[in-house]
């Protein structure tokens, strides 16, 4: 199953939530696909489910119900690429947004450099203090690599990877003049430009690699948060050479599967061509090189923005660009789109060859209306087939770190606690199920099924603490089944210090391949 998040906006930029399955068409490599899964997601819809508690009026000895975090927002600052001025403006805008953090929200601060990280918390002072420690962490010192000739990563990619001799010769002419070399040294100047391009490319490629690696790690971290999951990628954008296309698609696939929305904020604001920006020094000497660099700067700026747009639109998120009102950008991006759709299709005759499949999504209406459609650009075919055991494991893991409640099996969740001292307590997670309403497979005169029961505890900030899995292999004769009690109770204990916790219970059976997932909360004073 390939999932395609789609945001459809009208001509005023408002997300639409009134479309039906019949309004959409999905094309895989130009071939129309049958949409077999159609979901309309509305902002806040999971919040209502997450607020549900099992024991509304706990008796003495049972668990109380604390406030449950509903939304997790990770501010990911691309300090590898953010110039100081843009970093300060976006940092301050994030700080003003964090000052309005709701009681049921948790925020985290991550950086592409891996420095100055704060995990999910509702401690606004701690978050604000960390923002003030943000710095530009580029691998190269500012101004250290942009020398004579001033070759950008985009130009270096053209020169080294794409063998663009025109750009190389222009860079050689620039080096000849800015280094004060005689005309007959042009060949040497071109070699110097080639060396500088390789140097710039090496540094830029390393920074791109680190950025993708960190973003993948943040998506993986977000997948374990029990609620709405939003990443705000704050970056001027960056160049991503072709070889990183699989990394981009892997990140989008993981984000889609984990219901993680990536919203992108172009921290450059309204982009200005450096060649006409009076606040920036003009480091070029020859007019021809300046014209070429100006053209490449514009193409580079567009390519940088494309990366941010692709991450946002490919995960059902939003992209804020060409706007200096970063406060408004932060306000818009810290929440998901009001509406978005998830379209699922099963590719026919899909080869497990790892090849790229370009996607196109269209929206049709009667009468015809112009829509702005934002959707992922494609996916990569798998390189191996998955088996039933792997699929079951993935389903359970996805359900465990979700807040969506499922009721396909007759299961109830109850929680109790036992406080041994001021520092030690035990949470009892009790799974109650009705065995007579579970599907069994008859074989060798016995009723067979395997139940997988997973209980998990999260702290008050939604951080995963512990999970325990139990497997119940049922092989019962009819006469034994007839004597079963109306309810089975299976208890799982967790040792914790007093505090507030969230509980998640997932139960899956092997025969019906049905699943129930329930939420609970515990407050131990």
Say what each PLM segment does.
Residues 1-525:
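Scaffold/interface architecture of coatomer-like assemblies
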């Amino acid at each position: 199953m390939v999932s395609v998040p789609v945001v459809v906006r009208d001509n005023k930029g408002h997300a639409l939530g009134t479309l039906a399955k019949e309004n959409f068409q999905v094309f895989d490599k130009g071939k129309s696909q049958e949409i077999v899964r159609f979901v309309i997601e509305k902002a806040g819809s999971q919040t209502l489910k997450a607020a549900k508690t099992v024991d509304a009026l706990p008796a003495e000895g049972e668990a109380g119900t604390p406030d449950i975090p509903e939304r997790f927002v990770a501010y990911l600052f691309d300090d590898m690429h953010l110039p100081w001025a843009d970093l300060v403006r976006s940092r301050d805008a994030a700080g003003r947004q964090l000052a309005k953090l709701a009681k049921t929200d948790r925020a985290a601060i991550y950086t592409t450099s891996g420095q100055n990280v704060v995990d999910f918390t509702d401690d606004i002072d701690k978050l604000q203090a960390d923002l003030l420690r943000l710095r530009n962490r580029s691998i190269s010192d500012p101004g250290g690599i942009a020398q004579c000739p001033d070759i950008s990563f985009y130009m270096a990619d053209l020169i080294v990877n794409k063998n663009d001799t025109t750009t190389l010769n222009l860079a050689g002419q620039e080096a000849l003049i800015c280094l004060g070399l005689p005309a007959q040294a042009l060949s040497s100047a071109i070699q110097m430009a080639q060396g500088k391009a390789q140097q710039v490319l090496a540094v830029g490629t390393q920074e791109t690699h680190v950025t993708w690696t960190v973003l993948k790690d943040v998506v993986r971290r977000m997948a374990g948060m029990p609620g709405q999951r939003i990443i705000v990628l704050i970056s001027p954008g960056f160049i991503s050479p072709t070889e990183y296309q699989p990394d981009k698609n892997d990140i989008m696939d993981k984000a889609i599967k984990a219901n993680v929305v990536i919203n992108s904020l172009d921290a450059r604001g309204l982009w200005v061509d450096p060649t006409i920006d009076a606040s920036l020094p003009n480091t070029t000497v020859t007019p021809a090189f300046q014209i070429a660099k100006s053209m490449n700067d514009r193409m580079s700026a567009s390519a940088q923005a494309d990366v941010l747009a692709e991450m946002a639109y490919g995960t059902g998120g939003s992209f804020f660009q060409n706007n200096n009102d970063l406060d408004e950008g932060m306000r818009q991006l810290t929440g998901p789109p009001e509406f978005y759709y998830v379209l699922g299709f099963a590719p026919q005759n899909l080869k497990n060859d790892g090849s790229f499949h370009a996607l196109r999504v269209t929206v049709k209406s009667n009468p015809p209306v112009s829509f702005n459609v934002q959707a992922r650009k494609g996916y990569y075919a798998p390189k191996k087939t998955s088996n039933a055991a792997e699929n079951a494991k993935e389903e359970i893991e996805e359900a465990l770190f979700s807040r969506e409640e499922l009721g396909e099996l007759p299961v109830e969740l109850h929680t109790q606690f036992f406080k041994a001292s001021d520092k030690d307590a035990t949470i009892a997670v009790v799974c109650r199920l009705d065995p007579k309403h579970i599907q069994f497979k008859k074989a060798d005169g016995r009723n067979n099924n395997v139940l997988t029961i997973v209980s998990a505890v999260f702290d008050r900030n939604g951080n995963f603490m512990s999970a325990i899995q139990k497997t119940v292999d049922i092989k019962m004769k009819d006469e034994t089944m007839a004597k079963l009690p109306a309810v089975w109770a299976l208890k799982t204990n967790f040792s914790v210090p007093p505090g507030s916790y969230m509980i998640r219970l997932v139960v899956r059976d092997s025969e019906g391949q049905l699943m129930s997932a329930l939420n609970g909360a515990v407050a131990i004073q």
